[in-house]
Curated annotation (Swiss-Prot):
<feature type="binding site">
    <location>
        <position position="187"/>
    </location>
    <ligand>
        <name>substrate</name>
    </ligand>
</feature>
<feature type="binding site">
    <location>
        <position position="282"/>
    </location>
    <ligand>
        <name>substrate</name>
    </ligand>
</feature>
<feature type="binding site">
    <location>
        <position position="348"/>
    </location>
    <ligand>
        <name>substrate</name>
    </ligand>
</feature>
<keyword id="KW-0119">Carbohydrate metabolism</keyword>
<keyword id="KW-0732">Signal</keyword>
<dbReference type="GO" id="GO:0030247">
    <property type="term" value="F:polysaccharide binding"/>
</dbReference>
<dbReference type="GO" id="GO:0046355">
    <property type="term" value="P:mannan catabolic process"/>
</dbReference>
<feature type="binding site">
    <location>
        <begin position="147"/>
        <end position="151"/>
    </location>
    <ligand>
        <name>substrate</name>
    </ligand>
</feature>
<feature type="binding site">
    <location>
        <position position="243"/>
    </location>
    <ligand>
        <name>substrate</name>
    </ligand>
</feature>
<keyword id="KW-0624">Polysaccharide degradation</keyword>
<feature type="binding site">
    <location>
        <position position="144"/>
    </location>
    <ligand>
        <name>substrate</name>
    </ligand>
</feature>
<dbReference type="InterPro" id="IPR017853">
    <property type="entry name" value="Glycoside_hydrolase_SF"/>
</dbReference>
<dbReference type="GO" id="GO:0016985">
    <property type="term" value="F:mannan endo-1,4-beta-mannosidase activity"/>
</dbReference>
<feature type="binding site">
    <location>
        <position position="204"/>
    </location>
    <ligand>
        <name>substrate</name>
    </ligand>
</feature>
<dbReference type="GO" id="GO:0005576">
    <property type="term" value="C:extracellular region"/>
</dbReference>
<keyword id="KW-1015">Disulfide bond</keyword>
<feature type="disulfide bond">
    <location>
        <begin position="195"/>
        <end position="262"/>
    </location>
</feature>
């Protein structure tokens, strides 16, 4: 009996200490604890661009990020979108030949992210961790991950998989985002396969950050990274943040380049798909695109198999609806979340953090579980 007890104790100690609850995507909604959830929050993006985590940088940036989490909670929000590698300034660590050797040279990245996730957990705030920036990508080592399978595998094996394994027990980890706005470095071009044909996007401004990658290479990279995440953590949610509605729907004559068939066709890995859609939206000259998220309801996009998050928006680049009305519109028109840009208040189309706090207050405590409504906002993460 003593030996049996000792064996059972050993098994219990060696077992992953998973929480009983994690954010889930089912059909067109997010769920937590059996309740439909609306991700109401902000983009932290970064405090120090590309240098918030890893190589000891978190010591100077972590306190500010935690203060921002406090502000999200105080305003009634529940989610923040946080950028990790960005353009590879600090992480991952590359050798002289461009192969990834580890998460970062001082190997602090995982502990940094773990600490922030634990803090967010205590404040009932979910974090979406964004791996790379596709709007701008000037690091040749990161660029080569899109072209060289052996280098991409070195990232997957030596940085990504260790991160996912170390963090998969964190209930505040809402999702992994492979790329922010990959259309920024898209090389528009024609292709017989509609998944890869982006010829119509050239006139829409795609490639503003430098025309570096054809769509097929982007989709293959997303497919491989998503597959690796799902291999390490089958329950993980994965997404991609598109610059607009133009590339994540087949409605209105557009093309959904990130649907399952396009991703698996490009990369060949059946589990290398995204678990929810994510559109970014800003007005131009004070006008929304006619089919922008704040002009139509989510059902108009016909992507009803997965949740749909408005991953970036700002009241200063809207049609003067007011930030609280924008949050309410998303909540009442079938969207599964809305995140303002951006809490450090830097750059164009960025609301002040005080205005973003005011915006989140519009949905504080909301919990409408009826059809077409957002669901629960005040989430008790445990």
């Amino acid at each position: 009996m003593v030996k049996l007890f000792s064996f059972l104790l050993l098994v219990w100690v060696a077992s992953p200490a998973f929480s009983s609850e994690f954010l889930k995507a089912s059909g067109s909604n997010f769920y937590y604890g059996g309740q439909k959830v609306f991700l109401s929050g902000v983009n932290f993006a970064w405090r120090s661009y590309g240098s918030d985590f890893g190589n000891g940088q978190y010591a100077s940036n972590g306190p500010a990020l935690k203060d921002w989490i406090n502000k999200v909670k105080a305003s009634g929000g529940n989610t923040a979108r946080v950028w990790v590698h960005v353009e590879g300034q600090v992480s991952p660590a590359f050798d002289s030949h461009g192969f990834v050797t580890s998460t970062d040279s001082k190997k602090t990245l995982i502990n940094d992210l773990s600490d922030l996730l634990d803090y967010a957990n205590g404040q009932n705030v979910f974090l979406i961790l964004v791996l790379f920036n596709g709007a701008l990508q000037n690091n040749s080592n990161v660029q080569n991950l899109f072209w060289d399978e052996s280098k991409l595998n070195s990232y997957i094996n030596n940085a990504l998989t260790p991160m996912v394994n170390a963090l998969k027990s964190k209930p505040s980890l809402a999702a992994w985002e492979v790329l922010n706005e990959p259309e920024g470095t898209l090389q528009p071009g024609s292709d017989q396969n509609s998944c890869y044909d982006t010829s119509t996007l050239a006139a829409q401004g795609a490639g503003w950050g430098g025309k570096k990658f054809p769509m097929k290479q982007i989709l293959k990279t997303i497919n491989w990274i998503s597959s690796a995440i799902h291999n390490a953590d089958s329950k993980a949610l994965v997404t991609v943040g598109s610059w607009s509605e133009l590339t994540q729907t087949d409605s209105f004559g557009y093309r959904n380049h990130y649907k399952d068939s396009c991703l698996t066709g490009a990369g060949g890995k059946s589990n290398g798909i995204i678990n929810f859609y994510q559109m970014h939206t800003y007005s131009h000259s004070g006008k929304w695109n006619q089919n922008a998220p704040f002009k139509v309801n989510r059902w108009a996009y016909n992507v009803n198999d997965k949740p749909l998050l408005i991953g970036e928006f700002a009241s200063v680049c809207s049609q003067n609806e007011g930030i609280q009305n924008l949050y309410k519109y998303a909540y009442n028109n079938g969207y599964n979340g809305a995140l303002t840009w951006q809490f450090n208040s830097g750059g164009d189309c960025s609301d002040t953090y005080s205005n973003q706090m005011y915006g989140m207050q519009a949905l504080k405590g909301q919990n409408d579980q009826s059809g077409g409504k957002g669901g629960m906002v005040s989430v008790n993460i445990n």
